[in-house]
């Protein structure tokens, strides 16, 4: 039979779901049961019933000329079309993707649909009618169903129906339904794959037998993770990728280090033996970390290509490495050596994130990070996610760890294609890896592989998993390893014989034994309780001249106040900016936001790129920054910092999503990988920064001590008690001070625009040096425009950052000073305002006030020199606005005690211990604040009075 001329048959162009729709419409047309699309109604009137035909062959596979009009079989065609789509959408429910379970069975929706069609029904329908792209040899609908079941219900299973882009969805189906993904591997590649699996298994078993009881968090059960990573890395390299960033937890990490990142076995064994070995490169800080947290950087290559692979250092806080690694990738993708926004090339780098099956749906940082994937400020052109799925979280079964069928279901909400694959089918795993990298490189979007295996031992090697999962561990005990399974397959296929398989095994064992023999005995000669901090860190940041010539500042300011002709600045914003016009003149005053912009511009002119992000950072939470302008007519944006002259460094400022943890992790990672860049994260209010506490604890404060991982990240945390209640008052400075040690970061609470200008420039000057460290700034809110925080041009052009400032016009009669008051930030300004107001009568000859601008490291020498001036000093008082159990008091108390010596008392004035940072009544707040100020400045005040209102005492 030959095909009719389709130019006279309008139905020939309808296939699959479109065909089903046409048939449904014809049924409505005939029965009059509903409205019919007008265009189709016209076709029905001209051509009659839809008629479909195809070339056929004779025999059992023959599909004769088929027409609903001739057969009256409209319902069967619809059912076939629906069945095809259901196999594509729900084939995963029947797939054998879990090596610990038999192939899925039971009455699913898909099985019900299949039972309603006989083989004869299917044979009668031409293949092209329901699958227009059917490959050669597929003649009938029965062939189609067999073929699609083979694709969608075996050891690879796919979830693509949630993908919203029809082009992507069609590409994915075409890829898996064609033969391109599952082309048989060459015998050479099959043998190489077996060797890789033998190396992975041999390494793990060697550790298990040699270092009995030591934690290693074995990969066994998902051994194919290593070849999957190999495939993704090398396929990426073939596409020109220069950097591959990997983030993963401790499960399987040692094997990934040894095999993917080529860390020598001997170095791994030395870590287990606590031995020193020649050639081992230290990749940790002075306190170090356990071996299964450490990262590595390595150039990986084969005969054709090479690429740099970075495995990020990682704490045991599962999944928190995810945004850090995304930041690595974005930094690697961007060219920051030009003015304006940096140029991003997503083909230069990509991320692989290895997740746990319990952690992926369980940890909120996962969804926070996924939400970054399509955002302009954070997208990295697609991440490949691999869930190393061993179906248990420590001792918790999957039915207790998630509310969804699959651990990967969270990804559906972010439009991410998902492939489930049986970890006991090595070639299927490689097919999944190949699809993942092709999709990522083509569409620049995320892709997820759910690598389903098991965990051969307990959570760590000292656990007995049979205590909590007795049934499954009976199966696992008798279950062959993936290496053994694949070796049997290769022998059955005639690729290798038993002797050749044994030779591969023996070669691996000999290599392991040889490398172990190179490791000397344990070396405890330098074991010591004291861990030495590097000298350059211990010395702290040296005083740096950060002034900028006035003429340069004036030129910058002029540029900051200009915009393209025809650009319509919002009138209110225009007035704010115009007020800055004369700020650098003789009688001008510079407010906080202008000082910041001047600092940014001068830093850029010196060649340092800047990246600033936060939930409202372009405008500023308090409508103060206005660093990105919006045209009132077109909504176009413009930043004056992109057009200033003499700049060869990029500037980017982005509004972030409503997330703290993921964004802080991202910016930290960006800064680690771009150490020459001034990277800043701004909290909307400092109160909300504690949702990123794990990042502060595990990375920002301790990353260098643990891993030697340097960062100069700047945290801008709006802080200050202004009667706005417990959620808009405190950035929790006590927590940052509690973490302060070994000069790990700088914590500051400033009182002037000039101080902010200088500390930003100082921070920029140490980037990329051994002296670098993070900067934690308690930034102002009401003080942004406060008259007492304004600065003059000369204060920016001369000098440097001062860690402590003395209150002007006090301490003029040193011999009369009895009380030295120390405070910081807004509290210091409240004291200054009271002093300058002259409303109350204090004997100010007896009081001196010092503002501690840099809380950590504490400027002890500066303060000590001030104390020495006052021979008759009786007491040193710390005054703060926070409750006594918060703020800086518990950090300051021992410092004051040491400064005071034996003859001078120390004391505290402030709010008493409280469980909440602040009260909610603004009037009560005001009354408390006035009491604190009054008691701080009144030397005659009798300690321990009015304790109900505020806490006042001395030692």
Swiss-Prot record:
Co-factor(s): thiamine diphosphate
GO biological process: glycolytic process; tricarboxylic acid cycle
Catalytic activity, EC: 1.2.4.2
Keywords: Glycolysis, Oxidoreductase, Thiamine pyrophosphate
Assigned GO CC terms: cytosol; oxoglutarate dehydrogenase complex
Top EC class, one word: oxidoreductase
Molecular function terms from GO: oxoglutarate dehydrogenase (succinyl-transferring) activity; thiamine pyrophosphate binding
Protein's UniProt keywords contain Metal-binding: no
Domain of life: Bacteria
Catalyzed reactions per annotation: N(6)-[(R)-lipoyl]-L-lysyl-[protein] + 2-oxoglutarate + H(+) = N(6)-[(R)-S(8)-succinyldihydrolipoyl]-L-lysyl-[protein] + CO2
Function as written in the Swiss-Prot or TrEMBL entry: E1 component of the 2-oxoglutarate dehydrogenase (OGDH) complex which catalyzes the decarboxylation of 2-oxoglutarate, the first step in the conversion of 2-oxoglutarate to succinyl-CoA and CO(2).
The family this protein is said to belong to: Belongs to the alpha-ketoglutarate dehydrogenase family.
HAMAP family in alphabetical order: SucA_OdhA (MF_01169)
Assembly description: Homodimer. Part of the 2-oxoglutarate dehydrogenase (OGDH) complex composed of E1 (2-oxoglutarate dehydrogenase), E2 (dihydrolipoamide succinyltransferase) and E3 (dihydrolipoamide dehydrogenase); the complex contains multiple copies of the three enzymatic components (E1, E2 and E3).
Name of the protein in its database record: 2-oxoglutarate dehydrogenase E1 component
Organism listed in the record: Bacillus cereus (strain B4264)
Upper taxonomic lineage: Bacteria, Bacillati, Bacillota, Bacilli, Bacillales
């Amino acid at each position: 039979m030959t095909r009719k001329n389709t130019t006279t048959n309008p139905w020939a162009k309808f296939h699959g779901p479109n065909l089903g729709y046409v048939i449904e419409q014809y049924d409505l047309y005939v029965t009059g049961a509903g409205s019919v699309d007008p265009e189709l109604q016209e076709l029905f009137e001209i051509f009659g019933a839809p008629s479909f035909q195809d070339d056929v062959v004779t025999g059992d596979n023959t599909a004769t000329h088929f027409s609903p009009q001739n057969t009256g079989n409209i319902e069967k065609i619809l059912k076939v079309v629906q069945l095809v789509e259901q196999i594509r959408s729900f084939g995963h429910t029947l797939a054998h993707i879990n090596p610990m379970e038999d192939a899925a069975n039971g009455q699913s929706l898909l099985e019900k649909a299949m039972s309603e069609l006989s083989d004869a029904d299917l044979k009668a329908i031409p293949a092209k009618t329901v699958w227009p792209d059917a490959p050669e040899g597929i003649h009938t609908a029965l062939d189609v169903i067999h073929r699609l079941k083979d694709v969608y219900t075996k050891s690879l299973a796919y979830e693509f129906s949630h993908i919203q882009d029809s082009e992507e969805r069609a590409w994915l189906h075409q890829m898996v339904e064609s033969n391109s993904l599952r082309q048989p591997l060459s015998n050479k590649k099959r043998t190489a794959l077996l060797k890789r699996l033998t190396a992975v298994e041999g390494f793990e078993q060697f550790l298990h037998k040699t270092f009995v009881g030591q934690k290693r968090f074995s990969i066994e059960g998902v051994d194919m993770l290593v070849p999957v990573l190999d495939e993704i890395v090398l396929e990426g390299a073939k596409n020109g990728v220069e950097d591959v960033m990997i983030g993963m937890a401790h499960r399987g990490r040692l094997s990934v280090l040894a095999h993917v990142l080529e860390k020598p076995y001997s170095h791994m064994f030395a870590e287990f033996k606590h031995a020193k070995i020649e050639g081992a490169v230290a990749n940790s800080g002075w306190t170090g970390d356990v071996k299964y947290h450490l990262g590595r950087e390595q150039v990986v290559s084969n005969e054709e290509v090479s690429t740099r692979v970075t495995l990020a250092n990682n704490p045991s806080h599962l999944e928190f490495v995810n945004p850090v690694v995304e930041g690595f990738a974005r930094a690697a993708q961007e060219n920051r050596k030009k003015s304006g926004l940096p140029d991003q090339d997503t083909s230069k780098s990509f991320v692989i994130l290895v997740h746990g099956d319990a952690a992926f749906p369980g940890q909120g940082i996962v969804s926070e990070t996924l939400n970054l994937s399509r955002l302009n400020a954070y997208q990295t052109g697609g991440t490949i996610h691999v869930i190393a799925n061993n179906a248990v979280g420590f001792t918790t079964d999957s039915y207790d760890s998630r509310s969804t069928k699959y651990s990967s279901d969270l990804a559906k909400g972010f439009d991410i294609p998902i492939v489930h694959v049986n970890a006991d089918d090595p070639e299927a795993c490689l097919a999944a890896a190949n699809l993942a990298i092709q999709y990522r490189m083509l569409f620049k979007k995320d892709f997820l592989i759910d690598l389903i295996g098991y965990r051969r031992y307990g959570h760590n090697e000292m656990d007995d998993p049979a205590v909590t999962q007795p049934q499954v561990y009976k199966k696992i005990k008798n279950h062959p390893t993936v290496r053994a399974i694949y070796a049997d397959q290769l022998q059955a296929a005639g690729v290798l014989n038993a002797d050749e398989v044994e030779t591969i095994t023996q070669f691996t064992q000999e290599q392991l034994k040889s490398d172990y023999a190179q490791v000397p005995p344990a070396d405890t000669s330098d074991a010591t309780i004291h861990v030495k901090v590097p000298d350059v860190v211990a010395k702290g940041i040296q005083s740096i001249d950060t002034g900028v010539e006035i003429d340069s500042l004036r030129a910058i300011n002029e540029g900051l106040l200009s915009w393209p002709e025809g650009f319509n600045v919002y009138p209110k914003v225009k007035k704010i900016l115009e007020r800055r016009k004369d700020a650098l003149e003789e009688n001008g005053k510079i407010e906080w936001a202008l000082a910041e912009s001047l600092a940014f511009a001068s830093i850029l002119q010196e060649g340092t790129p800047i990246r600033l992000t936060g939930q409202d950072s372009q405008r500023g939470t308090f409508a103060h920054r206005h660093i990105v302008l919006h045209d009132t007519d077109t909504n176009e944006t413009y930043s004056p910092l992109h057009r200033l002259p003499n700049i060869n460094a990029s500037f980017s400022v982005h509004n972030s999503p409503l997330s703290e943890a993921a964004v802080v992790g991202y910016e930290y990672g960006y800064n680690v990988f771009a150490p020459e860049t001034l990277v800043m994260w701004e909290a909307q209010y400092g109160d909300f920064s504690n949702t990123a506490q794990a990042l502060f604890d595990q990375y920002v404060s301790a990353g260098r001590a643990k891993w030697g991982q340097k960062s100069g990240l700047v945290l801008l945390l709006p802080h200050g008690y202004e009667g706005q209640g417990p959620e808009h008052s405190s950035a929790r400075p006590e927590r940052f001070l509690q973490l302060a040690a070994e000069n790990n970061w700088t914590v500051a609470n400033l009182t002037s625009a000039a101080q902010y200008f200088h500390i930003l420039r100082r921070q920029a000057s140490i980037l990329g040096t051994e002296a670098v460290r993070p900067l934690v700034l308690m930034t102002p809110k009401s003080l942004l425009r406060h008259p007492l925080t304004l600065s003059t041009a000369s204060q920016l052009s001369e000098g440097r950052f001062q860690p402590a400032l003395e209150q002007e016009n006090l301490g003029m009669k040193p011999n009369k000073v009895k009380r030295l008051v120390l405070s910081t930030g807004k509290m210091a300004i409240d004291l200054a305002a009271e002093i300058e107001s002259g409303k109350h009568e204090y004997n100010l000859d007896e009081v001196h006030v010092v503002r501690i601008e840099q809380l950590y490291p504490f400027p002890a020498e500066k303060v000590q020199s001030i104390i020495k001036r006052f021979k008759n000093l009786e007491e040193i008082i710390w005054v703060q606005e926070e409750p006594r159990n918060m703020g800086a008091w518990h950090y300051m108390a021992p410092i004051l005690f040491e400064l005071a010596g034996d003859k001078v008392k120390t004391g505290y004035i402030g709010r008493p211990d409280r469980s909440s940072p602040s009260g909610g009544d603004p009037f009560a707040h005001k009354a408390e604040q006035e009491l604190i100020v009054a008691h701080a400045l009144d030397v005659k005040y009798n300690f321990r009075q009015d304790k109900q209102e505020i806490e006042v005492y001395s030692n």
